[in-house]
Amino acid sequence: MTTEQKLQLAEIRTMIPEMRRVECIHFVGIGGAGMSGIAEVLLNEGYHISGSDVAENSVTVRLAEKGADIFFGHHASNVEKASVVVVSTAIDQANPEIVAAKENRIPVIRRAEMLAELMRYRHGIAVAGTHGKTTTTALTTQIYSEAGLDPTFVNGGLVKNAGTNARLGSSRFLIAEADESDASFLHLQPMVSIVTNIEADHMDTYGGDFEVLKQTFIDFLHNLPFYGQAVMCIDDDVVRELLPRVSRQVITYGFSDDADVRLINYRQEGQKSFFTVQRKDRTDLDIVLNIPGKHNALNATAAIAVATEEDVEDSAILSALLNFEGAGRRFDQLGEFETGNGHAMLVDDYGHHPTEVDVTIKAARAGWEDKRLVMIFQPHRYSRTRDLYDDFANVLDNVDVLIMLDVYSAGEKPIAGADGRALCRTIRARGKLDPIFVPTIDALPSVLANIIQNNDLVLTQGAGDVGKLAKQLASLELNIQAMKELG
């Protein structure tokens, strides 16, 4: 950090009141992406941070190195020094740390409440939507950083250029991913809100009623001040439908002819995307984006729309997108397999909704037309598999080889007929593809070793622990013999 940035940070800190009577902030489930990001920013602001999780990971190691007290396992004693306890909705209310905190009258708050506190005295930019939040947050962060604006950011995944998912910046800007999964994004009061798209997901939160979900997004946008800005993707049918109900200033973006910020002339070559962005009363931008897919071009256009409103220099926008390294587990190219007679490419992707899987397949096809596409898919949550069963079957039918794992439950109880084996039967019955069901992830390396061919593109897909498998394979330098031995 430069001397000038240190002075700017000092000035910002004088404007932001410290949280009174708060000395130690404890995070239950601190190893998660969303929780760890907030914890890291608060740690850098000078608060004493502690946290617990079930196991060590790279995030807990980094936080411990920065001075946080990390506990493994959940025990009442972990919150003895806490002034406030931060939890996510994934944490059971019977957790002994939550119980102990309530018994001792220690405030227990949701992670979004703490994020809202960070945003309260800053120029907040909140990125919401069913898909694309993490990448759009990373893209916006990259542009603002390239422009020298040094934003604070809190993302749901790794911002590769920064090497972290959160950082305390020296400016007034805070860029954050806004989570609709538990409706907690309603706590946020940003200056700018992006909505990338709206689809039926996390419907248990909304009582299974899509109208409730749509109204919640409207309520989120109405948390903007009257002088705030909503940036909305007009290509999305639901977003377009909601536009007349938004009583805030709106900028639309997309491929559509009537978009305020319009994307045209898209093409993809390998991992790079090329397109032009047209802006009202501004010079057109010829973009080279260093990640593939039309969906990512849309994500970048959202970031461009926000940056343009802030009068960020075009040169910074162009440079940031050209040099953008991506977001963690978003079409993450991890290396190559040695197949014995050549090589196969390994890509890891977090997408776990049919729409996300579909755009990932399309990006792979567009950039690597000559490769056979081998997908290892791990369904995420029984409820999502049940609710979107036919959509999953339709999308997964579009790869060349499908290896299906069982559902990553994320704490849910099994639902009959909503598992990996059932999906395999449904897809097989259609006659186009013969999926291979692998009941345990430990058995996958040896299965994979017998399937991979020269020039394949192997895609690990899902939000569960399939990503850990991808890293494990990459750490073995993706050697076929090593995979056979691992299996």
Curated annotation (Swiss-Prot):
It is found in: Cytoplasm. Pathway: Cell wall biogenesis; peptidoglycan biosynthesis. Gene3D superfamilies: Mur ligase, C-terminal domain, Mur-like, catalytic domain, NAD(P)-binding Rossmann-like Domain. Disulfide bonds: none annotated. ATP binds at G129, T130, H131, G132, K133, T134, T135. It catalyses: UDP-N-acetyl-alpha-D-muramate + L-alanine + ATP = UDP-N-acetyl-alpha-D-muramoyl-L-alanine + ADP + phosphate + H(+). Pfam families: Mur_ligase, Mur_ligase_C, Mur_ligase_M. One of its GO terms (cellular component) is cytoplasm. The keyword Repeat does not apply. GO terms for biological process: cell division; cell wall organization; peptidoglycan biosynthetic process; regulation of cell shape. One of its GO terms (molecular function) is UDP-N-acetylmuramate-L-alanine ligase activity. Its EC number is 6.3.2.8. Keywords: ATP-binding, Cell cycle, Cell division, Cell shape, Cell wall biogenesis/degradation, Cytoplasm, Ligase, Nucleotide-binding, Peptidoglycan synthesis. PANTHER family: UDP-N-ACETYLMURAMATE--L-ALANINE LIGASE, UDP-N-ACETYLMURAMATE--L-ALANINE LIGASE-RELATED. Cell wall formation. Belongs to the MurCDEF family. This is UDP-N-acetylmuramate--L-alanine ligase. It comes from Aliivibrio salmonicida (strain LFI1238). The gene is murC.
